[in-house]
């Protein structure tokens, strides 16, 4: 009995020290769930996922290339960082492409309700991808992070469209310079 206890204790110590001595490391709940989400992905033709490390499913990039709307022809890259609290906590999503958009600020923060107060563990990576794609089809000036872009969208849709096109071609809007992001 004592020998069994000491073997269990030794195994615990090895695992906490990072040694696995013949046994493989167990996947966390977040890793299992993200693996399931990735396996069940049903990406629209305008979206693509890129993994820089195929062994790390918790960090990846999403590329959205809208084929209609204000942002048609653009290429927008988002980084996803899935924490160990997933699916109880939403992933951290940032837009890496500087974009003139009411719901994405100039630092890349994204205003999407399912990434904040409306997140539920039943939502998946697929839900977030469709939510992000929808932001490009229907920007929401009612819940803005970029208040200036939201105001222009509400008051002068034509000017908003011109600003979006100028920003995607690469150019200034006011004093802010946008890198070219056309495909």
From Swiss-Prot:
The record's Gene Ontology cellular component field reads: cytosol; nucleus
Q: Where is the active site?
A: 111 (glycyl thioester intermediate)
Where does the record locate the signal sequence feature?
A: none
Gene Ontology MF terms? ATP binding; NEDD8 conjugating enzyme activity; NEDD8 transferase activity; ubiquitin-protein transferase activity
Q: Which PROSITE patterns match?
A: UBC_1, UBC_2
Q: Which pathway does it serve? A: Protein modification; protein neddylation
Question: What does the entry report about post-translational modification of this chain?
Answer: The acetylation of Met-1 increases affinity for DCUN1D1 by about 2 orders of magnitude and is crucial for NEDD8 transfer to cullins.
EC number of the protein: 2.3.2.34
Q: Which organism is it from?
A: Xenopus laevis
- The kind of enzyme this is, by top-level EC class, is transferase
Q: What is this protein called?
A: NEDD8-conjugating enzyme Ubc12
